Regions:
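C-terminal helical "lid" of AAA+/P-loop NTPase domains
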Residues: 1-5
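Peripheral, non-AAA+ core regions of ATP-driven protein-machinery
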Residues: 9-23, 28-48, 53-235
Length: 235
């Protein structure tokens, strides 16, 4: 930075740096972070997951799913630079989502997407395709988006959720809850689902922000089982 390279300036204290200096001089060649707003309508196969990083930043991660023609029924196509743990979570989510459909729903899906001359798999895409993503905390969201696609039920757009998932449908503990929620509020989320196992973290969050306008009108729901998530999220 110029201010560090110029010895005649660095010896003068205090140093005054304005917001205008930061935007138009020192970081003029840097891209400004733009918070993408969530969708304004309920949709099938679209859910707001959540993310957080080690720097304390967080926000929403749109996760979308659609059927696509392929050689193997319900084969998964994964795009969006998911790393190994997240990809494994997607396979767990698919097994769970399929197991939760009724026999009647399974038959309808197979009659349409698993015929002799036409088979379909599921394409799952996570937003911000150029950014690597990993971790198991999107499991509940991925299960929900797959169940939505399989059953044709829409997902409420104002919700975001986080939580690891297992094959028995248990929603389990994650990290970075406060960063995920604060960033997602900026993106327009007004309702959150988080793991019951994170209740201590949630209480700490509420103690810190209970008098802050940032959480005015925001609803929070703990969940321990994926069915609780479905009951809240699905139209």
């Amino acid at each position: 930075m110029d201010i560090l390279k110029n010895g005649t300036i660095i010896d003068q204290f205090p140093i005054d740096i304005t917001i205008d200096d930061i935007k138009n001089k020192y970081f003029k060649d840097k891209q400004e972070v733009v918070i993408k707003q969530i969708s304004k309508e309920d949709q099938v196969g679209v859910v707001n997951g959540m993310w957080a990083n080690m720097m304390g930043h967080g926000g929403t991660l749109p996760i979308k799913a659609k059927f696509f023609p392929c050689d193997k029924f319900l084969d998964l196509k994964l795009t969006g630079l998911q790393e190994q743990v997240m990809r494994e979570s997607m396979h767990v989510a698919e097994t769970l989502a399929w197991s939760l459909t009724t026999d009647e729903e399974k038959k309808k899906i197979q009659d349409k997407y698993d015929t002799a001359d036409h088979k379909s798999g599921i394409h799952i895409h996570t937003g911000d395709g150029s950014v690597k993503k990993d971790g198991p905390s999107g499991g509940a969201a991925i299960t929900t988006v797959l169940y939505s696609l399989l059953t044709g039920r829409k997902i409420k757009h104002e919700f975001a959720l986080t939580g690891e998932i297992d094959l028995h449908g248990e929603v389990t503990k994650i990290g970075g809850l406060d960063s995920k929620m604060l960033g997602s509020i900026k993106a327009g989320v007004t309702s959150f689902i988080y793991p019951k196992e994170n209740e201590k973290d949630f209480k700490t969050f509420m103690e810190k922000y209970k008098d802050d306008k940032v959480i005015e009108g925001i609803s929070f729901y703990p969940a321990g089982q994926i069915q609780e998530v479905f009951d809240l999220l699905l139209v």
